[in-house]
């Protein structure tokens, strides 16, 4: 194996592993609650544990591990949790230059991103754009106990 081989090979994320999405804006974790609400959590909790599943290259669905509900964005840009994966549940995952990830609605558009405001409430898709701290998330792997 040469140095060039090492430089271009990256280890793919294990999508069976559990993750928290830590927002650059205010330090909140994305959480999916049992009632279908999506919000930011200041502290780590069971509702902020997520499973990010790739459906095709660069496209993911985000499932709340505790609730089994899927993150979705409606036609008004409001984030909600759905019991079924619909066309509103697919997000384009991209690692940005700052090494944070963004999650852009595949259905609704060029500049509709998942985002958390400074107060922990979710930001509507049409009010987001690249460069805002609200849309940058750092995936943090959750340590799982061995069975």
Swiss-Prot record:
This protein's UniProt keywords: Angiogenesis, Cytoplasm, Developmental protein, Differentiation, Growth factor, Heparin-binding, Mitogen, Nucleus, Secreted
GO biological process: angiogenesis; branch elongation involved in ureteric bud branching; fibroblast growth factor receptor signaling pathway; hemopoiesis; mesonephric epithelium development; neurogenesis; positive regulation of angiogenesis; positive regulation of cell division
Protein name: Putative fibroblast growth factor 1
Ranges where the record places region Heparin-binding: 117-133
One Gene Ontology cellular component: cytosol
MF annotations from Gene Ontology: fibroblast growth factor receptor binding; growth factor activity; heparin binding; integrin binding; S100 protein binding
Highest taxon of source: Eukaryota
Binding site for heparin: 25
InterPro entries linked to this entry: Fibroblast_GF_fam, IL1/FGF
Organism: Danio rerio (Zebrafish)
Function: Plays an important role in the regulation of cell survival, cell division, angiogenesis, cell differentiation and cell migration. Functions as a potent mitogen in vitro. Acts as a ligand for FGFR1 and integrins. Binds to FGFR1 in the presence of heparin leading to FGFR1 dimerization and activation via sequential autophosphorylation on tyrosine residues which act as docking sites for interacting proteins, leading to the activation of several signaling cascades. Binds to integrins.
Origin organism lineage: Eukaryota, Metazoa, Chordata, Craniata, Vertebrata
Family that this chain belongs to: Belongs to the heparin-binding growth factors family.
Compartments where found: Secreted; Cytoplasm; Cytoplasm, Cell cortex; Cytoplasm, Cytosol
